[in-house]
UniProtKB/Swiss-Prot annotation:
Signal sequence bounds: 1-23
UniProt superkingdom: Eukaryota
Keywords: Amidation, Antibiotic, Antimicrobial, Fungicide, G-protein coupled receptor impairing toxin, Immunity, Innate immunity, Mast cell degranulation, Repeat, Secreted, Signal, Toxin
Organism taxonomic ancestry: Eukaryota, Metazoa, Ecdysozoa, Arthropoda, Hexapoda
GO biological process, one term: defense response to bacterium
Organism: Vespa bicolor (Black shield wasp)
Membership in a protein family: Belongs to the MCD family. Mastoparan subfamily.
GO molecular function: toxin activity
Name of the protein in question: VESP-VB2
Keyword Ion transport applies: no
Coiled coil, from the record: none
Amino acid sequence: MKMSILFLFALIASLACLQLTFAAPAASPFANPGASPEAAPLADPLADPFMPISGMLMSGMLGKK
């Protein structure tokens, strides 16, 4: 049980690091600490390559023909 919790924590931490690695500089608060929160919606929509896929997953369109 303890190992599965540690594995889950390591998986989440590695995914967070990957997100910070591939995020656009305009959308990352670490890359641009002076950026205002209002500037986030104006960021490049192509900055997150997984956004269209997650949108399709949430709407249930992925996998339908």
